[in-house]
């Protein structure tokens, strides 16, 4: 199994039977009123032509615009309508309909215990069904006794861990590698008029909780290697750079070196 990072939460997973593009998002297609984009730019650092020529499956974890890059996907399906969309068993059909609207024709729907593509096993976990915009999912890929769990922004619930503990031993492997974000994109509490000391305490608590979440998942699933994806974010507007993490200031964002160091054993 080979895994290539394409920026933000994007990954290209290659197995002996399939090649899966996960959450592709290009710097040239900013999201959220053009305020949020991949940095540094990933158009030149990633061989997109190779990926688009070879991809067999597409996995988009959820509908947020930093994961569902509509402009890119329209172009992909216009050239490769044969690419099969891995579709989690969502409560709502919004994601499937959005794919249909932009030209997707082939779907791989979640089976009772996952799906097999040749000898590669694929399993999705639906993690949130609070409302239509917050349905999220994770993808487990098992190939030749190697496994990769792409968690991205989602959560691993007790029933997901139970499934992994029950069925993974039959594949003669554990969770060899996971990809998961460890920062989040919240502007709270910086967007509130708190006293500076209170604001710093809340920022520190937020950062600690995101790190604890990452480490808890890693420890509970006994993950051997891990990749931090989708962040940490950074604000580039000059009048707002004080909201980034510098030393001991009040910021909800992690310093990039801090995130690297907390999981440095897996480098």
What are these regions (language model features)?
Residues 69-79, 94-99, 238-243:
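Metal-dependent catalytic neighborhoods of phosphoester/phosphodiester hydrolases
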Residues 17-59, 70-75, 156-173:
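Pre-active-site segment of Zn-dependent metallo-hydrolases
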Residues 18, 79-84, 104, 222-225, ...:
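A short helix->loop->beta-strand "cap" motif at the edges of active sites that frequently abuts
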Residues 86, 159-263:
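Cap/insert and terminal regions of metallo-dependent hydrolase folds
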Residues 25-30, 34-35, 125-150, 154, ...:
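Active-site-proximal loop/helix segment associated with metal-binding centers of metalloenzymes
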Residues 29, 63-68, 92-95, 115-116, ...:
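Active-site environment of divalent metal-dependent phosphoester hydrolases
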Residues 18-20, 56-57, 146-150, 176-177, ...:
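Structural motif
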Residues 87-146:
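Metallo-beta-lactamase
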């Amino acid at each position: 199994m080979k895994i290539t990072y394409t920026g933000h939460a994007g990954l290209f997973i290659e197995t002996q039977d399939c090649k899966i593009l996960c959450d592709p998002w290009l710097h040239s297609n900013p999201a959220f009123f053009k305020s949020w984009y991949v940095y540094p730019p990933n158009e030149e650092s990633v061989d997109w032509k190779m990926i688009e020529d070879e991809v067999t499956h597409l996995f988009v974890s959820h509908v947020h615009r930093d994961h569902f890059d509509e402009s890119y996907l329209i172009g992909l399906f216009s050239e490769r309508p044969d690419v099969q969309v891995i579709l989690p068993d969502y409560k709502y059909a919004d994601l499937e309909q959005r794919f249909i609207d932009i030209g997707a024709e082939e779907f791989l729907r979640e089976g009772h215990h996952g799906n097999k593509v040749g000898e590669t096993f694929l399993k999705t976990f639906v993690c949130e069904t609070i409302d239509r915009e917050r349905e999220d999912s994770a993808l487990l890929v098992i190939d030749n006794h190697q496994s990769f769990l792409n968690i991205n922004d989602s959560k691993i619930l007790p029933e997901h861990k139970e499934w992994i503990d029950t069925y993974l031993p039959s594949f003669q492997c554990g969770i060899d590698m996971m990809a998961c974000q460890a920062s989040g994109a919240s502007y709270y509490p910086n967007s509130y008029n708190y006293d500076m000391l209170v604001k710093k305490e809340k920022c520190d608590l937020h950062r600690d909780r995101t790190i604890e979440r990452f480490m808890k998942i890693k420890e509970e699933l006994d993950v051997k290697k891990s990749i931090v994806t989708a962040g940490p974010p950074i604000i580039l507007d000059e009048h707002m750079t004080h909201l980034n993490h510098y030393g001991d200031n009040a910021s909800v964002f992690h310093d990039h070196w801090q995130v690297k160091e907390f999981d440095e054993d897996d480098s």
